């Protein structure tokens, strides 16, 4: 994945992902599980429901150590079946 993030970020840094997915109970657990694989830590993600309640957004902040970690997490979070978008 070619991005300009590497030019914009100085590592290590805090990096927040916003993951939008179907409003299912396992969404938060699946997001945390993927993040734990690449950035082990103690996470308390923030969850906000959509206005109709069909979707949830999960915000989670990691301590990123290199650009490959950031890009890998974008890819793997997007591969979760019930995830619709990762920002």
Swiss-Prot record:
**Positions of disulphide bridges:** none
- GO CC terms in record: cytosol
Q: Give the residue range of the signal peptide.
A: none
* Top-rank taxon, per record: Bacteria
Q: Which Pfam families match?
A: DUF493
What protein family is recorded? Belongs to the UPF0250 family.
> What PANTHER family does the entry give?
UPF0250 PROTEIN YBED
Write down what this protein is called: UPF0250 protein NT01EI_2946
Q: What is the lineage of its organism?
A: Bacteria, Pseudomonadati, Pseudomonadota, Gammaproteobacteria, Enterobacterales
